[in-house]
Amino acid sequence: MRVLLKDGSVLEQGKWKQTDVAIENGVIVARGEQLSFPAEKVFDCRGFALFPGFVDVHVHLREPGFSYKETIATGSAACAHGGYTTVCAMPNLNPAPDSSEHLAVEETLIQGEAVIDVRPYASITMGQKGEGELTDMAALSGRVCGFSDDGRGVKTAETMREAMQKCKAADSIIAAHCEDMSWIPAGGAIHDGAFAKAHGIPGIPSESEWKPIERDIALCRETGCRYHVCHVSTKESVALIRQAKAEGVNITCETGPHYLLLCQDDLQDLGRFKMNPPLRNKDDQEALLAGLLDGTIDMIATDHAPHSAEEKAKGLRGSAMGVVGIETAFPLLYTYLVETGKMPLEMLIDRMADAPRRRFRIDGGMQVGDKAAVTVFDLHAQEKIDPNTFLSKGRATPFEGWEVHAACRLTVCGDKIAYNALSRKE
């Protein structure tokens, strides 16, 4: 199939340039003004911005095992609606992808249902228990984007050391959910701060995150493993990672849109404000933005975590942990970081597309020769975030009702038109 994206605006060295992008059999074959390219599908992109497709290294697509929350089909459609062309799917599934046979179940679903590039993680431990026997990383590494027990922390230094050694030997990466449950009281639901104390809700202290990060940095220094910290939420975590990078430790990290734009001051006693890790203090939020700007935080990942309406209808105490975010990430960050002057647009694109692509060795992009990974956005849109418009099964977002000034109009992933809200010229 031959596709032409006509008259879009591409940001190059701080300047917008009107550009055509020609795609043949899923590969970018030409870029330039007024291309002569006979195409079966021509999309008029005049007035819209063209970006490399976004990459999210931390999503929960819930299949196999929990299709009432999300499916590969609905989740990948939601990703395309958000401008994403590649996502890495976390392994808290049933069965957990801890063996070749179990991984094949997920791979079959992806092959049959995904409209974008979905790459599975395998679990670090058998059954994704955070302890005990490790998965066969050497056997699985060629089929996965990395190894994670996301949703659980790896409980002991001995287990993590062995995992890092095996992961390094397999030339893969560990994406670590850093949470030490010994710090968290029964029923811990939100940050251990003013809101928790005022409402009598058990709080989750910052130590539960930064203590295991501190442990793992020492192990990473020892083993040389490629190591990535998931959903960083505390100022102490940022400081530890900044220092480790200065020492040359092979470490990267991510944070999420909700941690950059919200803090515990914004909490309401609603399930859509409950996620793990929780929204922290204002000074944590400020430290995360500073870390994103100075490169300590390498990338933005949504931790898109859909649940059923019933599971999110029990307030902060009783609701399941997790919010959706894949369809709202760029509109929110563009509106509240770029338009407010807190971050250059080029940096936001790097943190959402280029940096995760580099670290996780993901192909695709918008240059000639790349596997096509392109998203088209209207940066003059005036919309309000309405969960009823989501393609995800999940509806729980803390940003419901927020005004945003960007909207995805088209997403192209390889030879697939993964999302289309543009009129097409035949």
Where are these regions (language model features)?
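Alpha-helix-loop-beta-strand connector modules within alpha/beta enzyme cores
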Residues: 100-117, 166-176, 328
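Divalent metal-coordination and catalytic microenvironments
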Residues: 8, 26, 47, 58, ...
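Active-site mouth loops of central-metabolism enzymes
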Residues: 57-70, 119-131, 151, 202-206
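Histidine-rich, glycine-flanked metal-binding segment
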Residues: 1-53
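C-terminal cap of metal-dependent C-N hydrolases
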Residues: 8, 315-318, 368-426
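Metal-associated gating/positioning segment near the N- to mid-region
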Residues: 46-113
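His/Asp/Glu-enriched, well-ordered alpha-helical/loop segment
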Residues: 198-226, 293-294, 298-300, 305-379
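Histidine/acidic residue-rich metal-binding segments in metalloenzymes
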Residues: 132-300
